[in-house]
Amino acid sequence: MKQATALDILKTGKNVFLTGSAGSGKTYTLNEYIHYLRARRVPVATTASTGIAATHMNGITIHSWSGIGIKDELTERDLVNLSRKKVLKDRLQETAVLIIDEISMLHAKQLNLVNQVLKHMRQNDKPFGGIQVVVAGDFFQLPPVGSRGESNRDKFAFMSQAWLDAGFKICYLSEQHRQQSGEGEDAQITLDNILNQIRGENGVSAAAIAALQNTFYQDVDVNRTRLYTHNVNVNKINEHELALLEGETVTYNAIAHGDNKLVETLKKSVRTSDELTLKTGAKVMFIKNNSELGVSNGTMGELIGFTTIKPLKLSIATIDDGSADEDGSAEALDEALETLEDAEALAQNESDKPLVSTDRYPIVRLNSGRQVIAEGEEWIVEDESGEILASYTQIPLTLAWAITIHKSQGMTLDAAEIDLSKTFELGQGYVALSRLKSLEGLKLLGMNDLSLRLDPLARGADSRFKDLSLEAQQAFEDIEREVLQESHERFVIASGGTLNKANIAAFEKEYKNRKKKQAQKLAQKDKLSNQLSDHSESTLMATRILLEESLSIAEIAQSRGLAQSTIMGHVARLRRQDPSLNCEHLRPDEAILNKVSKAVDAIIAAGDPNDFNAADDSTQSVKGGDDFDKQRIKLRPIYEYLKQQIDYNTIRLALVFID
């Protein structure tokens, strides 16, 4: 099926499963549909089964969006507790279209839970509470990790009751858009060819196997990612590479509390070490989602140093690009951090997370170029009443010169060294190879008899999906264009959207202008990078230049490759330095300002020391009295006072404008 046909089906409001081989344009088609909905003001939620896939969609995980977390069952009491979360309830009730990307990695039980929660929250017994659900993915990817003894039949989402109830229309995309052609020694054999042969029913040709084997002799990028089937190989390589580094070493000892068996279960799910040793120069990967920090489970980078900042600042502080000297030492970063006068505004999270047993924390330069500080994260197990039964706290990083194939799902790699000689699960080889853009980026160390084989259940389902997609295509081709257009319009109206041409045109114009501005900002960012030094005042000036162009917080953050909360911190400092600074375009609604101001006054009046950060030179140098207290006030008490109805970033921004 072509993308245009799939979009026509999506616009009717039918529940849809969008699938196809790697590079067939699933994500592109989803983004086109999301753009169509937003132009018509139809409330759409973009989610994915994993953190790294969610970042590709500029969304969040389905687990977080729906409130199911990591559970695989929900009691009536659980549902009642979820209903009490106003933000969650409002979100689920207001959504008209739910998109779930990488559906292959969502367990059947969890799809059932999403269905259960939506029915409960929306008080609607129709599948998924009556909203349109669009799931996308490729079931030739590895299935989600399940309980011991579970078969793939138990795990695949298409085997769930929710899937059957939804009655998904199948859109199987057949065009190729990612894999590059004309590669390798034999121009007739491309990675696209090989992947399609693996998916096909006739097996992989001798020429394709030879093309793969010939990559053993290729020299690929020295910064390549290494993919292995087993953790033992991954650990061996990572430990070897770590030993070669001569940089500063810090070891983090995890902290565990509660029931021993539950703690062990947490450790297995976290997949990190009780004793985590890191060095400057290490390749690392985050192992827990942190939307406020801007990282996902699977985000990769390089450890460029360690810092000894206060715990509150550390968990969430983001460091400006270029704040380290060329050798990546931490001293320049420490100096830059110490100059920050408004640590609270730079905080990415005010949850007072527990600390692991050290006072030095990793500074990671992400592959995107942004730099962040990683603080200890806590994983917990709760009972039905919310009481914590077990907890495990560790720095959410793992060494990442090598990673398992399972962990690589959702990534797109320019170069990789892959060892399939110990393949033990059907589909591992396909997943590993489909991470790459071309054969030119592949160095294959070995294969075995399982490496190029796929799960029979997935293969059978895929064949059925193709047949159902053809049926859907033929059915829609018989519908007259005018009738189809009327169907599209009915769904928009039923979803609370608009057909007003002027409004749609205004959205499209704004969208084009935003794209144009983004291109200009990228050019401006490059110019600033060449002009500005690595000092704090220079990075403030870079933000000010963009601010004076009336760009939004999000636009400035994207342009500079920084977190939005970091930019808010810059705005706060700039406004204190120059109260006449023109940033009124960022000013929140008066109703929000009044609510935040009232909360601040109440918290200051209560005078609970736990609601304030410890004083330091930077805060004392600003003002005294109530203004001094306002500078030190934590975000969490404000958030709680407002009953979680105003998000952290809006509170941060409001504080800038409260006198």
Swiss-Prot record:
The keyword DNA-binding applies. Pfam families: HTH_40, PIF1. Keywords: ATP-binding, DNA damage, DNA recombination, DNA repair, DNA-binding, Helicase, Hydrolase, Isomerase, Nucleotide-binding. It is an enzyme of class 5 (isomerase). Gene3D superfamilies: P-loop containing nucleotide triphosphate hydrolases (3.40.50.300). One of its GO terms (biological process) is telomere maintenance. Its EC number is 5.6.2.3. Signal peptide: none annotated. The keyword Cell membrane does not apply. Belongs to the helicase family. PIF1 subfamily. DNA-dependent ATPase and 5'-3' DNA helicase that efficiently unwinds G-quadruplex (G4) DNA structures. May be involved in resolving commom issues that arise during DNA replication, recombination, and repair. This is ATP-dependent DNA helicase Pif1. It comes from Psychrobacter sp. (strain PRwf-1).
